[in-house]
Each structure stands twice: as C-alpha cells, then as structure tokens.
C-alpha cells in the first residue's frame, strides 16, 4: 500500500468518525421519566389541596403528609415570610411535620397555618408529650408566603384576612390531583413581568425513587430569556411540558435581566417551594437536599435569591423506600439533590406556562406572548 493510499484511507476514516460524532451529537438525547401525574403527588404519602379568593386575588396550597414526614428547609432570599422554620433546624427536637403551607398574603398569609393546626389538633393529630387527657397535640405546620398584596385584588379585610379559612378549605380538598397556574398559593403571583402561578413536576429514577416539587412562582427575576419565549428551565424539560421550545438560543448579557421586575423598580416578591421524595432520609440529609434543590431556582429564574426575594425551599421525606447500605447513602443524597433541582426548575416553568390572567389584570401571561 503506497503513501497516497494510506493517506486516503486515513481521511476516509476520519470523515466517517466525524460524521458518526456529528450524528451522535444531533441524535435526540434521552429524557428523564416523570411520574404518572407529573405532580408532587406522585410521591407516595403526599396529597395537595388548594383554595383561592378571586376577589382578593390570593390563595393557599396545603401539602399534606399522610403520616408525619421528616422535613428540612433552606432559605436563600433576602425577604422571607415564614413560620416554624427554626423548628426544622437539625439541632432541634421535632423531626417530623404534619403539613406544609404555601400561601399568598405575605405576613397575613402566615395565619393559614393556624387553620391547619386547629383542624388537625381537633382531630388528635400532632406532636404530643404523652397525650394527657384534655391536653391537645401540637400539629407541626411550617409555612412560607409570597407577597401578592399589591396585585389589584381587594385586600381591605380588616381584622379578618381570608387565609385561615382558605387553608382549611384547601386541606379538606386535598387529593392526588390539583390545578397548575392561577391557583392556590400562586393565584396572585407575578413572575418577573409575566403572570406567575403554581407549578409542579416530578421525576422517577431508574431505581424507582420519586422526587416531586410544588412551587408558587412570584420571582423578581425573569423565567424566560431576554427577547424570547424560551424558558431558562428549557434544558430540563420533559415531553414539552411547558411548550417544548427548546434551549438552542438561550443566552443573555450579564447585565441583561430581560423581563425581570426591576423596571421601573424592584417590587415585593418570593418564590416558595416544597420538594418531596419517597426515599427515607434523615433531617440532615433532607437539609442537604433542600440546599441542592435551591439550584433549581437559579436554573429557572434570573436573577434568583435577590435581596427582594424570600426564596424558601422545604423538603419532605415520606420514607417509603429505604437505603440500607451506608456507603450508598451519600451518593443517593447527591443524586436526589440534583434531581430535586431539575424538578424544581421544571415546576417553576410549568407554573408560569400554565398561568392565566384574571379579569382586569394588566400582567400578560406566557401564552399571550407572540
């Protein structure tokens, strides 16, 4: 074989390899698998109920653990509104919660957890020190709220804000299915310059573990790229769950925040979420998962964790699946945390994608964009 033949063979081989590589790069990448509902309720032991007041433009979402669940929380925003978050610190006594409430109403919305606690205590559910006769239990009901007081709804409620009543209505309607978009805690939300809402998503691993998230999206930051309809969460989308526009042209200059709320001025905000898994985790492991899940906010919202936000993520472990090998636990927590971030990013995009305008609202929806 002469030199020319050898060179020609090498070029043909290189061209074939390049073509194969290009073909591999252009081939559709495998996507993850969602649960049957693509909701947080795909996690065994979790139900969700929602209620809203259309006149006040506000609402409540209750995430119910069918039996008390191990929980943790991570707070990153500069202006949070929360209840019982200190209870969830790893050094404290109580490990399990009965429910978590996401609510509109800012400080007024914190009363939503009062309604849940009273409802549960009356039925004998909650933390107790021996259950002495006549001593009610103490239901553990952490809560976080978004600021939706300036969205044009009637907030002249005087001494009777609606949140306690809305929370009980939500709890009593808790089920496996619930509405996304303009519903529940996200009813009165605004995400950047678009109508925000309640979003949810889930993922199932090859091992059969399930991770789900529910979120009220009321961010100061934008969920779409500047000059685009593409969601920042697009790289993580499964089965066109929020429009299927892809991520090929996602880009932005570092000072271009697009449709954020900084024009004309920053306004009150907060994105609040609950992530759940059916894998049995300790409080410390739930805490690590919550920390990692916050990355989902950064993947889906730009900017995130701003001084004007109150970004808060709770994690629940329902303990249906156990991992007995100690050597595998840290790996499992790492996997769960990464999946949680992706699922939360998807849930954020779904909340905005599914949002609809209420009558008289000046805030455009994602679906109204041309």
Where are these regions (language model features)?
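N-terminal secretory signal peptides and thylakoid transit peptides that target proteins
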Residues: 1-13
């Amino acid at each position: 074989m002469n030199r020319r033949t050898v060179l020609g063979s090498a070029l043909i081989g290189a061209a074939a390899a390049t073509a194969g590589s290009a073909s591999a790069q252009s081939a559709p990448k495998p996507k993850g698998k969602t649960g049957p509902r693509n909701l947080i309720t795909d996690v065994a032991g979790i139900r969700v109920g929602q209620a809203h007041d259309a006149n006040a433009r506000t609402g409540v979402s209750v995430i119910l653990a069918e039996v008390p669940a191990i929980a943790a929380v991570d707070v990153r925003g500069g202006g949070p509104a929360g209840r019982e978050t200190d209870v969830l610190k790893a050094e404290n006594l109580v490990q399990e919660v009965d429910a978590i409430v996401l609510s509109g109403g800012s400080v007024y919305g914190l009363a939503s957890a009062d309604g849940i606690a009273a409802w549960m205590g009356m039925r004998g559910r909650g933390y107790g020190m021996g259950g002495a006769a006549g001593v009610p239990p103490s239901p553990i009901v952490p809560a976080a709220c978004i600021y939706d007081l300036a969205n044009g709804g009637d907030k002249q409620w005087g001494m009777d804000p609606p949140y306690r009543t809305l929370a009980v209505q939500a709890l009593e309607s808790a089920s496996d299915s619930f509405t996304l978009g303009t519903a529940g805690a996200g009813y009165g939300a605004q995400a950047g310059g678009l109508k925000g809402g309640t979003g949810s998503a889930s993922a199932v691993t090859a091992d059969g573990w399930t991770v789900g998230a529910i979120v009220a999206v009321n961010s100061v930051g934008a969920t779409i790229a500047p000059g685009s309809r593409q969601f920042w969460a697009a790289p993580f989308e499964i089965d066109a769950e929020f429009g299927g526009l892809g991520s090929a042209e996602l880009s932005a200059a570092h000072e271009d925040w697009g449709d954020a709320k900084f024009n004309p001025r920053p306004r009150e905000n907060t994105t609040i979420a609950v992530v759940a898994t059916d894998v049995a985790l300790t409080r410390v492991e739930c805490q690590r998962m919550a920390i990692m899940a916050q990355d989902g906010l950064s993947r889906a919202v730009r900017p995130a964790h701003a001084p004007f936000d109150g970004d808060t993520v709770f994690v629940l472990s329902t303990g249906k699946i156990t991992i007995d090998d100690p050597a595998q636990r840290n790996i499992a927590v790492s996997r769960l945390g990464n999946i949680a971030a992706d699922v939360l990013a998807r849930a954020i995009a779904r909340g905005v994608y599914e949002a609809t305008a209420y009558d008289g609202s000046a805030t455009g929806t994602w679906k109204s964009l041309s």
